[in-house]
């Protein structure tokens, strides 16, 4: 029994039936054209989908396969979007946001989103920082085994935090300075873990990805094995397809 329509994304061009895609619940994916917008959808077998790894991957895979098939300009829709009928899409999405959707298509045409996440070893960085600031290390060592006042504890903690922040910012600045000129737009997000120090998405010309990738690798070499970099060069443009 159908629970409605599960929506994956919106495209500016029709997608022929020869493009065969499989979505959530192993359902075939179809396209529906409304007022010049092509929606990829499948029959929803559930009213609400659990954001499990399997379901998230299935959702993303539909969009990525469409991109591989040559339909690179798209507006990905959030995971779990189920509507009862197309009238809901018209009244709640197209009528109020039609102009903004078309502006987003223009912005994304010929461009792709890539993301860079940078990780460091916080314990190793702390030790390296202390080794390079002998005065701070000596001050910390002198306090070991002593009964410290709250003010002393706060003071030494602030000094350590400030120096670690400076190390972190110097790394981030290198990446930003060398990658920003290659991008049309950059959106920085909060780090997701304690060891993640930078999390950013870049909107770049589609054909320039290899240049961007080489630059990321070049920066990585500058820091030797100090950092771990997670670079994603093929994803739907979730970060840059936001309706304001």
Curated annotation (Swiss-Prot):
InterPro entries with a match to the protein in the record: GvpL/GvpF (IPR009430)
Subcellular location field: Gas vesicle
Entry GO CC: gas vesicle
Protein name in the entry: Gas vesicle protein F
Keyword Nucleotidyltransferase belongs to the record: no
Record-stated family: Belongs to the gas vesicle GvpF/GvpL family.
Subunit record text: Binds GvpA.
Known role: A minor component of the gas vesicle, may be involved in preventing GvpA aggregation during gas vesicle nucleation. Gas vesicles (GV) are hollow, gas filled proteinaceous nanostructures. During planktonic growth they allow positioning of the organism at a favorable depth for light or nutrient acquisition. Cluster expression in E.coli (gvpA1-gvpA2-gvpC-gvpN-gvpJ-gvpK-gvpF-gvpG-gvpV-gvpW) allows cells to float and produces irregularly shaped gas vesicles.
Organism: Nostoc sp. (strain PCC 7120 / SAG 25.82 / UTEX 2576)
Regions annotated as coiled coil: none
GO BP terms, alphabetized: gas vesicle organization
PANTHER family the record matches: PROTEIN GVPL 2
UniProt keyword terms in alphabetical order: Gas vesicle
Domain text: Has 2 domains with the C-terminal tail tucked between them. The C-terminus adopts a modified ferredoxin fold.
